């Protein structure tokens, strides 16, 4: 047993269009967590990976490509539209974000709300600032009992990072490079707030468990490694494989049998194979 007592899980705004079914599944998930003494961090929005999310049948995994099916929420197109003053999606998004926060505002099964993962990533930069400001405003209208956060290191743009540092109840950050881990902790400790590293552990960059865990313990910092089981998300492959995504899709190099998922010589993220 790894003795994990928490996990970080992403929701998606589009699922609010199937609210009743979504909430049934979310309740099942929270019940399973509670039975296993796990309190999750819940992530609402995300600027990373595929830019055009949709309901229905999802992309097949692309063989050997890191996170080939991961979809942004709400997606860069909508975020850019909001930045330009086109607000046609705001009502729908506001139904989702304050809606889920309000329903679970007093729920002791949830540890923390991570409102927006890595705003500014994947080339959008500070065009995400306007939407991020709205997300923070909506969250403070509800003001759930659980702490609120959005990461600092991991986000892109000075104004975005400044906003997250001002608003976050808990300082969260993402560090995958071994030489940056302890300096980042020392820098962020100046905020004098509880601190959690919500993403780390890239073997290729040196942030192995053996290297990282003593540092987190030394500074009393909570930590969440990326990845658990090497499955269809294939995050045991490195980020550089994302550059091959378009070519691999054109060649239809999809995983149609989950048993066909390949393995790199050295895993990037993840801990277990699918058979445990």
Where are the predicted features?
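Substrate-binding cleft of secreted/luminal carbohydrate-active enzymes
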Residues: 194-276
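Active-site mouth of glycoside hydrolases
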Residues: 1-170, 174-175, 179-182, 191, ...
